[in-house]
Amino acid sequence: SKLRRDNPGLISCTITGYGDTGDAAQKKAYDFLVQAEAGICAVTGTPDAPARVGVSLSDLATGLTVFSAILRALLQRGKTGQGVDLKISMFDVMADWMNMPLLAHRYMGGAPDRMGLKHSFIAPYGAFRCANGALILISVQNNREFTALCEQVLQQPQLPTDPRFSENTARYANRIALEAIVNAVFEGFSSAEMVQKLHPPKHPRCILTECLIIS
């Protein structure tokens, strides 16, 4: 308070694990613990087991949130001359990142299932193994992308008019049959050949990259 009196434009920021009041304020707030308690682990992993995100998500996200909040405070001070005391908890940051699962739980009958590299609402989506054992990921988001995939990659232009696959809701409901079709094609080509087939930018795809390649 003395610093504030001496400098009304002061901007301060306090980072906590679970806030600064109540019993939770005394809890340890390691990244893994915050991920788990905020629900991140419950929607991450495979149907068999939850998992933590493979990087320190809570730490990184909190840092980004603090950065954004301080920038906003600087803009506000530039207009008003007044500073602000910011209080940001790691748990609140992660709870905010749970926006989609929480909305699904409230309005769509339940939180999304853990799906590994697959998606709980979209198909075809996920990793498909090629003839040489390598995995290629595709992420088809709409009917236009699905039609392009069927015509140019799968060489089955009739699929988009098949009632089982004509819309995303139908594709997801029949995803086992659809994934079998996609798998049958991918298994007939090496990953290099499939990358070439998927080369046009209209095809949402990537390879599953290991740390060795990135480094």
Language model: regions and residue ranges:
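Alpha-helix/helix-capping structural signal
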Residues: 93, 144, 209-213
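Structural signal for conserved beta-strand scaffold positions within catalytic alpha/beta enzyme cores
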Residues: 14, 42, 90, 161, ...
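Aromatic-enriched alpha-helical interface/lid elements that frame and gate functional surfaces
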Residues: 124-205
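Short, solvent-exposed polar/charged micro-motifs at secondary-structure junctions
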Residues: 96-100, 170-178, 215
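Alpha-helix boundary recognition
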Residues: 4-5, 187, 199, 215
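Conserved PLP-binding catalytic core of the aspartate aminotransferase-like
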Residues: 180, 206-215
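Active-site-adjacent "lid/gating" segments in soluble enzymes
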Residues: 2-140, 148
